Amino acid sequence: MKAIITGGAGFIGSNLVDKLVKEGHEVLVLDNLSTGQLKNLDHSKNKIKFINIDLSKKTSELKEIFKKSDWVFHLAGLADIVPSIIEPKKYFNSNVLGTINVLEAARENNIKSFIYAASASCYGIPKKYPTPEDSQIDTQYPYALTKNIGESLVMHYAKVYKMPNTSLRFFNVYGPRSRTTGAYGAVFGVFLAQKISNMPLTIVGDGNQTRDFIHVYDLVEAIFKVAKKNPEKKIYNLGSGIEVTVNRIAELIGGEKIYIPKRPGEPDRSCADISKIKKDIIWEPTIDIENGVKTLLDKIDNWKEAPVWTPEKIQIATQEWFKLLDKKDDK
């Protein structure tokens, strides 16, 4: 198959590139390198094609690029809460306009399978755990909103234009090449950079909050199986189905800990109900958190150039978050 991976120079995208190349598929990566890095593709550069392109602008080029392609994996987009609060239009351009441009190019070229990387942030603060796909959508900030609008577009195109579209709601993904920037979301990148610098691990809140961490190798295996199975017009959660506390992650990484105030709008728990994808795709996550963290520690030097977030830097970076999302004054 000829596969197009948007955002293929990023953390998840580059790991998906590895999987598809290993399986013998032809791969074309589209990325504007705003957050992705070419070094993530260095080991595959002679086996793939790469185009530096802004998906929110080059609409006519996209239609030509997508010709004779079979699979599209739309992973490109902007993440992070705080920047989305400060620059919502930038996020709409990337996550909404970019998505509709990719959909149009795919529609005009009769793609055989279209897979969208959605976000579990669409659930906001869920009322049910594990959280199933039919849970209430309650986006808390522009990043979550734009990713969910993108998903709505993907499902709408499947309905109206009979496109073979599937949306996967990613929970907390970690593993090789995980991003190192941003004071939110990249907990492993923050912790590992702090450990290298012999600094305390900065924990937001009391550390008892749970997250559903899925290793990127398990994630790309699921994505690949979805592409082969092609379950059209379906939405799936993609996580491990297991809750792990942030304190447990800090314990596995090792070192002193320091605690800073909890941020508003963040759930105390996160856990994916993955029964639907397990049944439909015949997939199971295989890497537990203990072994997953061990593999990261074995290659901790990969994070030696990562920016080191001190508690003070994190609090400064998230000032706007507290200002806009703290609802104490609304009571």
Predicted regions and their residues:
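N-terminal Rossmann-like NAD(P)+-binding domain of SDR-like oxidoreductases, especially those catalyzing
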Residues: 1-173, 217, 299, 303, ...
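Hydrophobic "lid"/C-terminal helical patch
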Residues: 16, 223-227, 250-253, 274, ...
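Glycine/proline-rich active-site loop of Rossmann-fold NAD(P)-dependent oxidoreductases
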Residues: 148, 173-189, 197-208, 216-217, ...
